[in-house]
Amino acid sequence: MKRYVFMLSDGTGITAETLGNSLITQFENIQFEKITIPYIDSTHRAESVVLRINQCFSEQGTKPLVFMTLVDPEIRQAIKKAHACVFDLFSIFIGPLENELEEKSSYTVGRTHGVANVKSYSHRIEAIDFALSHDDGIKTRGYDKADIILIGVSRCGKTPSCLYMALQYGILAANYPFTEEDLVGFRLPEVLRPYKQKLFGLTIDAQRLQQIRSERRPNSKYASAEQCRLEVTEVEAMYQRENIPYINSTKYSIEEISTKVLAIAGLQRKI
């Protein structure tokens, strides 16, 4: 069975996508065709979206699902005229909040992902810049400013996790990959010892590591099953020997890796 799913927003669409995806992933036997439409900022644009939704209804014979985070009441009402099952994620929560807080909402578009808070936005940019300039062990001199330093073998998820922590949490995250030289005896590199309290390890199943590396450098020693097993075994032994906290990233998304790392490390959101 296939169902169309529309994620509608007057902003970036990130919130509608996040909430919508969280709900539909609970239905494993249904194939969802997802369509995100951001920046619906007028009733005219809303009406064109309704035409598109209705077209899907006519073609499929089943109502599309619509998850929307639209602030303007007129635009919301326009969307609700569609032949669809509409989930108004804004009005579901804003009414009860107004009652509890005894204050009316400002109904301002773009509060979540906009630049309303200049200080928060500036810190996010600083964190992203830090993650990029301290990626892959490129620059270790700034490690004293890092909130956390991810370590691990090559291709276990360090770089995307650091960027996600920077973008979503404003965390200053660096990462250091273990090289061929580090593999000899697999001792903690001296450059990392002064920052041991900031270190957090990632590991990965050897079979999965081989798959990832083979896509990058097929038929190489780097991607061989033996090399991957050796590196994973040695790095996990080193984590345990050095008392460095670590998680296995094999079955987790980047979002899950990042939140687990922050929770275990006891780091709080900065933005």
UniProtKB/Swiss-Prot annotation:
Positions annotated to bind ADP: G152, V153, S154, R155, C156, G157, K158, T159
| Reactions performed catalytically | [pyruvate, water dikinase] + ADP = [pyruvate, water dikinase]-phosphate + AMP + H(+); [pyruvate, water dikinase]-phosphate + phosphate + H(+) = [pyruvate, water dikinase] + diphosphate
Gene Ontology terms for molecular function: ADP binding; ATP binding; phosphotransferase activity, phosphate group as acceptor; protein serine/threonine kinase activity
The EC number on file is: 2.7.11.33, 2.7.4.28
Q: Does the keyword Nucleus apply?
A: no
Q: Work out whether the entry's keyword set contains Endoplasmic reticulum.
A: no
Q: Which domain of life is it from?
A: Bacteria
Pfam families xref list: Kinase-PPPase (PF03618)
* Keywords from the UniProt entry: Kinase, Nucleotide-binding, Serine/threonine-protein kinase, Transferase
The similarity comment for this entry is: Belongs to the pyruvate, phosphate/water dikinase regulatory protein family. PSRP subfamily.
Described by its record, this protein's role is as follows: Bifunctional serine/threonine kinase and phosphorylase involved in the regulation of the phosphoenolpyruvate synthase (PEPS) by catalyzing its phosphorylation/dephosphorylation.
Q: What is this protein called?
A: Putative phosphoenolpyruvate synthase regulatory protein
